[in-house]
Design a protein with these regions (language model features):
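Mid-length scaffold segments of soluble, non-membrane domains
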Residues: 88-140
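Sec-dependent signal peptide cleavage junction
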Residues: 25-68, 75
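Solvent-exposed coil/turn segments that connect beta secondary-structure elements
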Residues: 79-81, 101-103, 110-112, 150, ...
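N-terminal post-signal-peptidase region of extra-cytosolic proteins
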Residues: 60-61, 78-94
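Helix-rich interaction surfaces within compact, conserved domain-sized segments
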Residues: 132-192
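Single conserved hydrophobic/aromatic residue that forms the stacking wall/gate
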Residues: 1-11
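Soluble periplasmic/extracytoplasmic beta-strand elements of cell-envelope proteins
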Residues: 75-77, 97-99, 104-108, 146, ...
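Bacterial N-terminal signal peptides
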Residues: 14-22
Length: 192
């Protein structure tokens, strides 16, 4: 009987060790799950904060761009050109822009080509006076600005659309010297 009582004690101890070990493992799993959930909640909160900051900055940029259009004091710095058949190319905003400064406007397009072009940098520049400036806002908050530029010997019709929620805009240029309508995309910023 002493032997069976000792074996029973060993089994009880083993059962107690197994129960303790499984409880400890479950507690560690629970702690790991809690830490994982905390990290996920922190990441989600950080993403939400960054998204809210980005939306606020975009809204400020949009308001500044709208005011610049109303004041007729802006530059659309194009970083992408969309050709007639839909092909796109990235371009330099230093040489591809539309500027409106009161009654004067400059429309310059220049592509990275080995040919100098009429403006000496591989494209065309129309610099002159504006006429027929019209600014409208649609029901979604997109702002449209249309005007004509009359330069020396050449002119162009300019159609700008500023999308609501940021300062990203597109401009369509219809020059009088050819039928190659160009669409540029970039940021519209106030003229400093």
């Amino acid at each position: 009987q002493g032997y069976s009582s000792a074996a029973s004690d060993v089994y009880k101890r083993q059962a107690l060790v197994l129960v303790s070990a499984s409880t400890l493992m479950y507690a560690q799993e629970s702690q790991r799950d809690i830490r994982r959930a905390d990290r996920k909640a922190q990441r989600d909160a950080e993403r939400a904060r960054l998204k809210a900051e980005e939306q606020a900055a975009d809204q400020v940029a949009y308001q500044q761009a709208v005011q610049a259009i109303k004041d007729k004091q802006f530059v659309l710095e194009a970083d992408q050109v969309i050709f007639k058949r839909g092909q796109t190319a990235f371009v330099s905003s230093n040489t591809n822009f539309v500027m409106l400064n009161g009654q004067r406007a400059t429309v310059q397009v220049a592509f990275n080509t080995p040919y100098p072009g009429p403006n000496g940098i591989g494209g065309v520049t129309v610099d002159g006076t504006t006429s027929d400036v019209k600014v409208t806002t649609d029901k979604r908050g997109n702002v449209n600005c249309n005007f004509s530029v009359q330069g020396i010997g050449i002119s162009a019709q300019v159609f700008i659309t500023l999308t609501n929620g940021g300062n990203n805009a597109t401009v369509t240029i219809n020059p009088n010297f050819n039928s190659n309508t160009l669409t540029l995309s970039g940021n519209l910023v106030p003229l400093n």
